[in-house]
Every structure is written in C-alpha cells, then in structure tokens.
Swiss-Prot record:
Protein name: Transmembrane protein 168
PANTHER family the UniProt entry points to: TRANSMEMBRANE PROTEIN 168
Similarity annotation: Belongs to the TMEM168 family.
Domain of life: Eukaryota
Parts of the chain that traverse the membrane: 36-56, 63-83, 89-109, 172-192, 199-219, 223-243, 265-285, 293-313, 352-372, 380-400, 646-666
Compartments, record wording: Nucleus membrane
Keyword Methyltransferase assigned: no
Function text: Plays a key role in maintaining the cardiac electrical stability by modulating cell surface expression of SCN5A. May play a role i the modulation of anxiety behavior by regulating GABAergic neuronal system in the nucleus accumbens.
Keywords: Glycoprotein, Membrane, Nucleus, Transmembrane, Transmembrane helix
One function term, GO molecular function aspect: sodium channel regulator activity
InterPro entries on file: TMEM168
Residues carrying sugar: N111, N533, N598
Topology class, membrane: Multi-pass membrane protein
C-alpha cells in the first residue's frame, strides 16, 4: 500500500515538474525573443549616438550637440515615465518619435567628408546589425506565435517614427524637405498596402524600392541609415502577408467600420491627391526637347486618365453609399448575430465589387501610362506623388478584389407550410380532430418561426412565408412560384441562390399534395425553373420537411443542365415509444435550422438512434457552380446606373477584360475532379457558400 502511494505521489510530482519545465521553457523562449528585440533597439540607439557624435566631431556644428543631448534627455524622461510612473503609452510614444527624428538627422546630415572614418564605418556596421536583428526578431516572433495580429492601418510605433523622420527632413531646403515628407507619406501608404495584403502590394514594394535610387528623391546622404529606417518599418507588414490570419473584413475593419463622414472625406482626400498628381504630371509640358512626343502623348493619355479617374472616384463614392446602407442594417440588428459580411453579401456588394475591381484596374493602368509619358526623373515631388498614388489605387483595387472573392452571393427565400397530418385514402387532406388542432397549430407556428429565423440569420431576402390550413391550389401555387423564381436584385441581375422551403403532405412518389386533388411534380417545378432562369447561372435549393422527400432527392441527381439541390428528411416510422417520441413534421426543420444558425450546437446527424435523419441530393453539375460573374450586359447596366454618358466608350474595354479566360485548362481539370467527388464521395456536410450547409445522416 505504501509503495503504491509512493509511486502515485512520485508519478504526480514528475508530471508536475515536467509541465513546469515546459512552461518555463515557453516563458524563457518568449523572454529570449523580447530580449532580442531590446538588443536590436539598443544597437540602433548606439548607432545613432555614434553617428551623431561623428558628425559633431567632424563638422563642429553645435546644433548637432544640442539635439543629441536633448535626444538623450528625452529618452531618459521616457525611461522614467516607463519604469517609475507606469506610463507605458506616453513613454513609448515619446521614444519612438525621437528615434525617428534622430535617425532622420543621421540620414540627412552630410557625411561626404568623413565617409572613410573608422567611427563612421562602425556606425554603418551597427546599422546593418540592427537591420539583421530586427528581421530576425520579427521572424522568430511570428514563427513562435507570439504576435497577436489586430486590425489596424498603421501602428502607433510606425506612425510616430514616420512623423519624427519627416520632422528631421525640415533641416533641408523647402523643396527637398517637401519631397522627403511626401516620400514618407508614400512609405506610410505602402505599409498600409502591405498590411491589407492588396493584390498589387508586392509590385508596389518593388517599384518603391527601385525608385529610391533616384537622387532627385533626395534620399539621404547616408543610404545605410535610410535602409535601416525603411527595412525596420517594412519588415512587420511584409512578413504579415504570410503570417497574418486575419480575414478580409478583419483586415479592412478600421476602414469598413469607420464613420460615414470620415469615409466620405477619404474619397475627397483621394480626389485631391489624384488632382495634384495630374497637375505635377502636366509640368512635363515645359520640356521642349521632346515636345513632339510629350504634347500629343499627354493630351491623349491625360484625357484617358481623367475619364478613368472620374470613374474611379464615382466608384468609391458608390461603394460608400452601399456601405452606408449596410451599416444601417448592421447597427439596427447588432443583437441578431448579423455580421457585416452577411449584410454586404445580402445587399449585392459582391456584384458591385467585381465590376468595380475592373474599373479601378483601368485607373491603375491609366496612372502607369501617364506616369511613363510625363516621367520627370529630376522632379522629386513628382516621383513622391507617383509613389503615393500607386498604393492608393492598389488598395482600392485590392479591397474590391478581395470583397468580390470572399463575399457570398445574394439569395432569396420562400416558405410554404401546409399543416396537415391526416389524409384520406386517396391522399387528400381531411379535417383534423379538435383535440389535435392546437398541437398542430403550435407545431406549424414553430416551423414558420424557425424558417424565418433561418432567413434572417443568413440575411436571405424573404419573398414570403405562406401558411395555409386548407391547402393551396395548383394555379395559386403556380403564380406564387412564378413570381418567386423571377425575382431580381436591386441592381438588376438575378439572385445567386433561390431557396424554396416546403412542409406539408406529399404522396409516396414525393409529389406535393395540393387542394382539389392536384399535385406538383419535381419535373414541373424544374420546367418552371428552366423557364425563369434561362441562361443565367443561378441555383435552386429545395428544403423539404415531409414524409416522402427521398424520391425527390434521388430524382434530382439525374438532372444535367441546372444547379439544383434537394435537402430532405427521413422520419423513422418504427420507433420504440418507451424510449423516444415518434417523429413528426417540424422536427427536422427545428434541428436543421439550429444546426445552421448556432455554431455551438450539439447536433450530430450521423449518431445512431436518431428518429429524424437528413438526406440530400444535388444535380450532376452542382460542383461546377460558381457565383455569378459580371457579364457584358451587367457591366453596361452598372455603367448606365452609376456613370456619366461620356465614359460609355470604356464599356467595350471592360467587356473585353471580362471575356479573358487564361486558365481554362486548369479550371476544366479541377471541374472534372469536383464532379467525380460529388458523384462518388458525396460529403456528409456540404457547404453551400451562403453560410448554411446541406447535411446527410
């Protein structure tokens, strides 16, 4: 007995000590990474101090000594605020501002007369060491998972260091100082572009780096110091392109959730930047050396640029108008689990963004052409403005590109509930006994509430929820379904998904039992769908809570030319009443809606003993379905709705771009593999891409 107790005690002690060692190892690793960051910062501080000391020693400029001593004094105050008053934010802000300012001084003070000095060489090596340590620290932090990514455009550290660097540039002449300040703004735009993972962020980074070699940009006298400043700021957003796990709307949250006035002002600000760039480009007309090339080129491409950027600004304005509508819904239903993603999808934002992506691409193309035609290698202000405009338009293109790819399509739903549970031998509904009326009414009301909750949760536009105790005639149902199947979005195109829900009596073959002895076959419903859908690539999802839904599930698998799915239920008829209640209509709806509207549900469709099982089937081409891409007519309608008539000639160019399909071979192979998977290995859970899933037991 004592041996057993001793063994248990020693085993528990061993486990505790092992866990303590693991925790200590994790803490030590985290501390090591932090110390590596401190080392990089201290190394940079030593390099700055040594560099400023060399400049004071060689030039005997007393102002450098004053600034140097003041800088050390400020850093001392920052340390006191941090360690003695626990004012971390104020301390770090002050130190970052001065780091940027002192590093800027190190960049812009002339060192041509003592480039080969030993202390100057030591400063360069210290700066290079700081670059290596900074990159290593950022990389290890991300590999070890110690970085918690938060949605932001510019961090406080980046902003303050950029401001400090810009202030340091005021030691130069006004024109040179303005060029550097604009270059700092361009660097800030590039950082935001990288952090947002814009589609063209990497090409922008390459262009920015290449253009820094132009002496007209007044890049500093000390290129090593400027490289240190540039790389230390770029490292984090560049690495986050791979390591950041934020979704599209999370990354763009500081912009998408901004107030209406701020977002409108951002469009005005963008327009002012574009106009300034155009005016600076026009300075090229003063070059009389190549007037025969410059004047015609600027006239032609300048007009093209103006038309494209009128469209660009109108597109941004229209985007914010639609986003304001989404905000109204979002703030009205904040307690109803509604996210901005689903609201934007339901408002047709995806279709708008796909068209806008092409239009903004024209703006980028026009800017690149105008920049090439009016290239001014000796004008630093022009080059800095060019580097500001490129990331600005790249961010707009990236926003539309990513929203167009990640947002779900529009959807509309229609529900029919016919509460009947008792039928005559010929299959027609009969009157219910009085004792069952209240129970059936409660169950039918529960089904209606559940399906309405489903529509509201997934932001599905509701055409109607019909509840009829006497049944629907064939003509009435035909007219209602006809109106439902021809519904369109506010912008004009058809909805991407049409969801039809039915709960009521069915025959053994799956046909819906209607009033007056009529029935509705699946073939008839498919013919109505073909008539209304035409060549458009919408899809139809039929949800059945009935006793005989399996025949429709099997029959839909034979359809070749449409995107149709049937989600049905199987009610187990042989149930031990002592163990469980017999299944009834409405039980499947309750479970299916809970499964799709509550992420923390405990519903398992494959568990044994379920009295209500799920089954679904899809048409043969279901896996080929993609959300509707803008056609030529869609682009033309969008153009007529949002843009002036003078811009209509660009419709043909937009249509041509829509028609490009450069990867058709890869897409064909991928489509065949998906068809094979859906026909042979039908998944237990099928994501529809609209936020809800089809399931089978």
């Amino acid at each position: 007995m004592c041996k057993s107790l001793r063994y248990c005690f020693s085993h528990c002690l061993y486990l505790a000590m092992t866990r303590l060692e693991e925790v200590n190892r994790e803490v030590n690793m985290h501390s090591s990474v932090r110390y590596l960051g401190y080392l990089a910062r201290i190394n940079l501080l030593v390099a700055i101090c040594l560099g400023l000391y060399v400049r004071w020693e060689k030039t005997a400029n007393s102002l450098i000594l004053v600034i140097f001593i003041l800088g050390l004094f400020v850093l001392g105050i920052a340390s006191i605020l941090y360690y003695y008053f626990s004012m971390e934010a104020a301390s770090l802000s002050l130190s970052n501002l001065w780091f940027g300012f002192l590093l800027g001084l190190l960049c812009f003070l002339d060192n041509s007369s003592f480039k080969n000095d030993v202390k100057e060489e030591s400063t360069k090596y210290l700066l290079l060491t700081s670059i290596v340590l900074r990159i290593l620290c950022s990389l290890v932090e991300r590999i070890s998972g110690y970085v918690r990514h938060r949605p932001t455009l510019l961090t406080t550290v980046e902003f303050l260091e950029l401001v400090g660097f810009a202030i340091a540039s005021t030691t130069m002449l006004v024109e040179k100082s303005l060029s550097v300040i604009l270059l700092v703004v361009a660097l800030a735009m590039l950082i935001i572009d990288l952090r947002m993972k814009s589609f063209l962020a990497i090409p922008n980074l390459v262009i920015f780096t290449v253009l820094l070699f132009f002496s007209s940009l007044e890049t500093p006298k000390n290129p090593i110091a400027f490289a240190c400043f540039f790389i230390c700021l770029i490292t984090d957003p560049f690495l986050d392109i791979y390591f950041s796990g934020l979704s599209v709307t999370e990354r763009w949250k500081p912009f998408l959730y901004r107030g209406r006035i701020c977002r409108r002002l951002s469009v005005v600000f963008a327009g002012m930047i574009e106009l300034t760039f155009f005016i600076l480009s026009a300075f090229k007309l003063r070059d009389t050396h190549l007037w025969y090339f410059v004047i015609p080129g600027f006239s032609i491409f300048g007009i093209f640029w103006m038309i494209c950027h009128i469209i660009f600004l109108l597109t941004l304005w229209g985007f914010h108008t639609k986003l304001n509508d989404c905000h109204k819904v979002y703030f009205t239903h904040r307690t109803d689990y509604s996210s901005l993603d689903r609201i934007m999808a339901s408002k047709g934002m995806r279709h708008f963004c796909l068209i806008s992506e092409q239009l903004v691409f024209f703006s980028l193309l026009a800017t690149a052409i105008l920049g090439a035609v009016s290239w001014q290698p000796t004008n630093g202000i022009f080059l800095s403005m060019f580097l500001i405009v490129l990331p600005l338009e790249s961010m707009a293109h990236g926003l539309f590109h990513e929203l167009g790819n990640c947002l779900g399509g529009t959807s509309v739903g229609y529900a029919i509930v016919i509460p009947t549970n008792f039928c005559s031998p010929d299959g027609q509904p009969t009157l219910l006994p009085p004792e069952h009326v209240q129970e059936l009414n409660l169950r039918s009301t529960g089904m209606l509430n559940a399906i309405q909750r489903f529509f509201a949760y997934h932001m599905i536009e509701t055409y109607g929820c019909d509840y009829s105790t006497s049944g629907l005639s064939f003509d009435t149902l035909h007219s209602k379904l006809k109106a439902f199947l021809e519904l369109r979005t506010v912008d004009g195109p058809r909805h991407d998904t049409y969801i039809l829900y039915y709960s009521g009596h069915t025959h053994g073959t799956g046909e819906w039992a209607l009033a007056g002895g009529d029935t509705l076959r699946l073939d008839t419903l498919i013919e109505w769908w073909r008539e209304k859908n035409g060549s458009f690539c919408s899809r139809l999802i039929i949800v059945l809570d009935s006793e005989n839904s399996t025949p429709w599930v099997k029959e839909v698998r034979k359809i070749n030319d449409q995107y149709i799915a049937v989600q049905g239920a199987e009610l187990i008829k042989t149930v031990d009443i002592e163990e469980a209640d017999p299944p009834q209509l409405g039980d499947f709806t309750k479970d299916w809606v809970e499964y799709n509207c509550n992420s923390s549900n405990n519903i398992c469709w494959t568990e044994k003993g379920r009295t209500v099982k799920a089954v679904y089937g899809v048409s043969k081409r279901w896996s080929d379905y993609t959300l509707h891409l803008p056609t030529g007519s869609d682009v033309a309608k969008h153009w007529m709705l949002h843009f002036p008539r003078i811009t209509y000639p660009l419709v043909h160019l937009a249509n041509w771009l829509c028609g490009l399909n450069l990867f058709w071979i890869c897409k064909t192979c991928f489509r065949c593999l998906k068809r094979l998977k859906m026909s042979w290995f039908l998944p237990t859970v099928l994501d529809t891409g609209q936020g809800f899933k089809l399931v089978k037991s």
